Amino acid sequence: MKVIGLHSFRRGVGKSTLAANLAYLLAAAGKRTILMDVNLYSPALEIFFKLKRDLSAPTLNDYLSGASPITELVCQPILDLPLHLIPASSRTADMISALRPSWDMTVLLNGVAELDASLNPDYLLLDMASGLHEESILCMSVCNLILEVLRADAQNYQGTAIMVGVARRLQVEPRLVLNDAPLDLDLPVVRQRLEKAYDCPVAAMFTHSDQMMALGAVGGLFVRQNPDAEISQRLKELAASL
């Protein structure tokens, strides 16, 4: 099993959108894929699959607090694909509780091992909370690869430098994904500058898309609804490179 974390230093850069679409593409290619929402502060993945789960259904929060086995959290959002989703709780009380965690986050390590043994996945994708904190470092430590998602602005650049350094100290391979870039940006030049500045590869670059932004307002998977779009082709290339 290859564990891939999607992370960003700042919120709102499209990290969850990338995670959901990549998980779908990997599963559509026949790869057994688990997508786990470890962004306990602001969970979002259920929206992309338009799941209507009962609020009492177990989530990752329940596993981390010892209230439920991790295997009971797994759901299959698209029945004809080998894709499994482990959602985080969207209950307001649980999101507030996550700000002052009362559980041992190292329990996640045991959960990952149990998922590997029970489901034998090819890929486990972790949609991580943005920023630098104890939970993000723990999640990074279980990964083989980190996709650090950023936008083309100074604050993103500074924060990304920090996160790339953390990944290297944890001996986890970092790759960059530039998202929502202005349409007039010279992407080849920016790619060269990013790779030189951070000394790591740029795995993909995506320009701003009004179509994707509009879909984000109602939910759904962009690559599933727009398989021939240019962004979908770049997402497919990124998925194949993993």
Put a short name on every predicted segment.
Residues 1-3, 241:
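Acidic-aromatic/histidine active-site loop/patch
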Residues 216-235:
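C-terminal boundary of histidine-terminating zinc-finger modules
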Residues 3-69, 123:
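Walker A/P-loop NTP-binding active-site region of P-loop NTPases
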Residues 51-55, 166-167, 192-195, 220-223:
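Short, hinge-like loop/turn segments at secondary-structure boundaries
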Residues 40-116, 216-218:
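P-loop/Walker-type NTP enzyme "switch/lid" segment
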Residues 234-242:
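C-terminal alpha-helix
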Residues 107-205, 213-214:
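Conserved catalytic-core segment of NTP-binding enzymes
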